[in-house]
Amino acid sequence: MANLLFLCTGNAARSVMATVMLRSLCPEHHIRGAGTFSISGLPMSQRTRVALASFNLSDPNHRSHQLDDADCEWADLIMIFEKEHRDYIERHHPDSMAIVGSLPRLARELDDSDQSLSLRIAKLDLDKSAFDPWEEITDPAGGDQEIFDLCAKEISALLNQLALRF
């Protein structure tokens, strides 16, 4: 059983979608989300709720949460969506850099061997890798429902690949 954390900016869209989706794919793991610039206690955005509903998923109890030291200590893996999230962890939680990787990179590079998840993460040398433009999942905030739906589809496709490796 792994402790998996998704980190986005406000913990209202991308990390919420990913958390709810991965919980449905991997119920045996502990999965939660947080934000780098979040107002704690807010529900997910309405557009996020609708995007999740298109996958027959929901989390009516979600409340936004600002990333803190306890989250970083808890997590076996922190999955991010853009370079700014990596930069935030590097500034505020540098001891966690070895377990921080973008969702696209992890979906592409995490192997599915029988080794422990922590060993497979360590082999990626995430703290030494640069964040490349192909790794970004654009924040749908401020976009219309179609933008949120496209973001949810992108996240879902990546999680369907990655879930097989946990």
Predicted feature locations:
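Conserved active-site segments centered on acidic
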Residues: 1-75, 83-84, 96, 164
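A short, active-site helix/loop in glycosyltransferases that binds the activated sugar's phosphate group
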Residues: 82-90
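Phosphate-binding/catalytic loops
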Residues: 90-166
